[in-house]
């Protein structure tokens, strides 16, 4: 494996190489490559989002984050169907992520929920056909981020331009990297494979219904940062209940641990470098292969932004409440939904 090929490995792959190292020299080499990968990734991400902020305004820096997520994921991941059809679907997904979150913010919580359900149905049914590729962690997360950081007026016009550029970049990279791959299925096959009795379809329906429901309830309760609850729910919903229960436990414990660590850093560090706590969290996520640790470090970035608006106490309270509510609601909802579907299946 070349230096460049090793740089392409994810955290789990890199750590697997470290564990299999037989000599100190070999292990030191893999550690060096791993650290270089983290440094290069962080530098590239920071530069990419900064450029988007300069071009389209600081209020649209989140567009840079969403586009970056799509580029990094879909340069390797696919949608499981013909490359041409997949490319057109990606363009459609960008249209949905650009328009629907903005429109949903203009509606009442209930009407917004219905629009979000319709939008997520397209993203998940056609973009997340394989749950174990975790495309929902890109598409649904991107949708929720744009929903939570909505803008209006001139800023939204700039957002339209930024997302159009992001769509063009993502589709170009995706098509270039996948055009020589052979796929035997097409868009119609995805429709025909919709089966209410399958674990995949039940998982998709849970994502489609539960995430917007969580957003709606949080907004009806006048809870700021409703997207946090939605992201927590999305992250916890998996096809198998045992995996969901594991995620819920790790999400709750990870967020509480992250809040405690962030609070300690907040009081120890000078106020001039508070914003860099989020960058520290990004590095931590890059070094983490397990979901629990990722939940800890993801908290840093979220709180670094939220403390500017709500203060430390308000941001910490919101983070814990929204995450616990999101994952617990998702667990209860999916447990009932899976049980109901199993009862229906027996009747059929």
Segments (PLM) and residue ranges:
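Alpha-helical transmembrane segments and their membrane-interface boundaries
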Residues: 1-137, 141-297, 305-348
